[in-house]
Amino acid sequence: MLKKRIIPCLDVKDGRVVKGINFVNLTDVGDPVDAAKAYYEAGCDELVFLDITATHEERDTTVEMVRRVAEQVFIPFTVGGGIRTVEDMKRMLQAGADKVAVNSSALANPQLLADCAEKFGSQCVVLAVDAKKEADGSWHVYLAGGRKDSGRDLLDWVQEAVSLGAGEILLTSMDKDGTKSGFDLPMLEAVSQVVSVPIIASGGAGSSQHILEVFEKTAATGALAASIFHYGQVSIAETKKAMQAAGLEVRI
């Protein structure tokens, strides 16, 4: 059985962490390496860096950031945002990222998943999906940070993506994102019924109880959150103790 993973998410722009992290005495709250080290020491299992840098020219700062993080942090980390080509993915992996997440570029060009998986292996390729529930009860995949309906059915898309070579799914509920009311359990369960790759739950975490709940009630193997970790509202160590007490497989 796969161990359950707690995964903080950091937004980076121009090689700097955008949202301040207040849960530890960081000398430089905007430094991704300091933030990553602090999370590593706090006991997280993996990290996700989401690059919200706007232009292609500025990506060199991201590559440099990845290199610095890889030198000093010894847990797996994923980099996502702005990955459009096999070459983009290659640069991130060569710099030291363990996995690379693709989102809208995979929707625009599904073959990208197959090309990347063939070159680097499925274990490096993470499909990031933003989804929202529709009036008919189905879920649609959204683009542009959840602002634009792609028209694609979520369950169809994840099955296609996995068949092409995606080795993991980072699934964000746009309905739950930012609400702190708990993860979208029905959506996670629906996706886990149609694919067999690991799923990271994202969107809605507001407490350690929500993290416990997503692992007890769905097949998700990872729980991702940002602000509850950044602002020290939830202790990773305490959450893991609760998970262990509940009989879940976890790295202490």
From Swiss-Prot:
GO cellular component: cytoplasm
SUBUNIT field: Heterodimer of HisH and HisF.
GO aspect biological process, one term: L-histidine biosynthetic process
Biochemical pathway: Amino-acid biosynthesis; L-histidine biosynthesis; L-histidine from 5-phospho-alpha-D-ribose 1-diphosphate: step 5/9
Function: IGPS catalyzes the conversion of PRFAR and glutamine to IGP, AICAR and glutamate. The HisF subunit catalyzes the cyclization activity that produces IGP and AICAR from PRFAR using the ammonia provided by the HisH subunit.
Subcellular location: Cytoplasm
Keyword Aminoacyl-tRNA synthetase set for record: no
Family according to the record: Belongs to the HisA/HisF family.
Keywords: Amino-acid biosynthesis, Cytoplasm, Histidine biosynthesis, Lyase
A GO molecular-function annotation: imidazoleglycerol-phosphate synthase activity
Protein name from the UniProt record: Imidazole glycerol phosphate synthase subunit HisF
Main location per the UniProt record: cytoplasm
EC category name: lyase
Record-annotated active site: 11, 130
Catalytic activity: 5-[(5-phospho-1-deoxy-D-ribulos-1-ylimino)methylamino]-1-(5-phospho-beta-D-ribosyl)imidazole-4-carboxamide + L-glutamine = D-erythro-1-(imidazol-4-yl)glycerol 3-phosphate + 5-amino-1-(5-phospho-beta-D-ribosyl)imidazole-4-carboxamide + L-glutamate + H(+)
E.C. designation(s): 4.3.2.10
Keyword rRNA processing tagged: no
Entry-linked InterPro entries: Aldolase_TIM, His_biosynth, HisF, IGPS_HisA/HisF, RibuloseP-bd_barrel
Species: Streptococcus sanguinis (strain SK36)
Gene: hisF
Transmembrane segments: none
